[in-house]
């Protein structure tokens, strides 16, 4: 029983005996008897790396525990039964009164009796630590190691300094040569030789940066048949080189795993990677199209289109391919969304020209399809019909028009236009006549080609509509306030028929000023006297009062069917007393333009014409509304300086602080910002572009600060 107790760890079965504050220095003595267990023994009079040194008298420090509280004891006098070889777990019995100094129990042979005992797990740990401490550190004393221990009172031994020249010449990365078996080296050399021979056999010269064919993917067919033959020969040579050799089966495992994760089989992915020299993109393209190139049989035909940004390897794969009837790859899809290539240009041009001669059948054809196929340019686009606006940069007003036209088809006209829903038969008749007469007038701002004028449209009253529609459908103001109101109620009268507007605002502040369309360039009515269809256009002698002028340079701005961007902006004309006539040549140009491409269908009223107040003289410091070129909207600005030519001025946009040079015709007084609301009057009227008015407010909104740009 006693033996079992001695061999048991006291921390598991011991009873608390030592006071809690024995380590605090306040306890002066401990009254025995008591049994404590040795946890650790250390000779504090010798260095730790040589505790058995006899240079100084031995003084042992013992870590003792009663199973709950640990304390430290000092060998005050020599203990005969305790040494450094006494294992932890040994039990000692303290007799009498044990003096305590600064938390240390003072032990000697008179108050200490060794009972013995062996705690197995404590002894194993202790023996392991002792065996490891015997290992000497071999790098002591050499370069880079710790300095050797020098006993106190002795001088440091001088170590011979290492020659710096020897250090410079020493190779720090000297590796011991490992002799490999002869057979392994021979096999490696054979593989290496085979790989070199395979590369040399292909004799393929690498040209970086695209070589002489850089940019051929951007110019379809630019290389010609000669380039195709050269590339086919290179492809055949490359394919033959792939078909033999030691490493022909090796593929990039990472690329293989990437393709298999997309759902392709491992064998198909491996074959595709082998066919395209581990080019992941080319391999994916071949797998997506389902046509794997056969290396030995030469380049097969592949049904892929040439998109933007194609690599040369992909170009080689499709040299002899024919373009599919529909987009079959990602590149075909991107090609339809990005850039304007010649193929798509011809396709869209042919579609737009075919629409010139076909008549609309219903509202969907009149509205939605025209939005998809007509050219709605932005303000800075001013080329002919061979150039299109960016596909992804439609102004917000066009998007609103599409939504509004769809709303009209699904829900009917807005409820606020009750006066225009009086008779469905009148509406149908008006729509039919509207489609006949107005298709000679495209809605977009860009001037197209003036050279196409079908004779059939001349017979259908295209001349008449091409003159009336700019006044009616483009949101221009014509006549004074009373005349316009009268015109709304009397649709078939001959007083102001060509100058009324759809969804028009009557600004009473400018009753004496008359507005014109950007494309109206005639000053008399001689051309229109023999027009048969009075429903499409009516004019009388009062038409001569509405002299239309080109604000900037008159007829000289039109040349070869093109007009400069600045010349396209017109504004209100001086009062009736101003007499400026344009030439008959301008009239013919206008009609040719208006009949070049016909469109019909619901169109929202466009931004009212930018006003040029001809009689207004600007001075530096004047506040105004200036047109900003990017979004084609008016913002509050201040005139900073006027150009000596009298055509432009430098303005500072008040809310943004940036300076821009603006044409004087694109500057108007600050009072022109106000718009007056008009009541619900008028019936169905020509110039509505196939749809009743949706709003009495102009498309050009009031000033709203745009979002901050990055």
Curated annotation (Swiss-Prot):
Domain Tudor: 617-677
Keyword flag NADP: no
SUPFAM superfamilies given in the database record: Tudor/PWWP/MBT, UBA-like
Subcellular location, record wording: Cytoplasm; Nucleus
Compositionally biased intervals (Polar residues): 453-471
Limits of the UBA domain: 250-290
Protein name: Tudor domain-containing protein 3
Origin species: Xenopus tropicalis
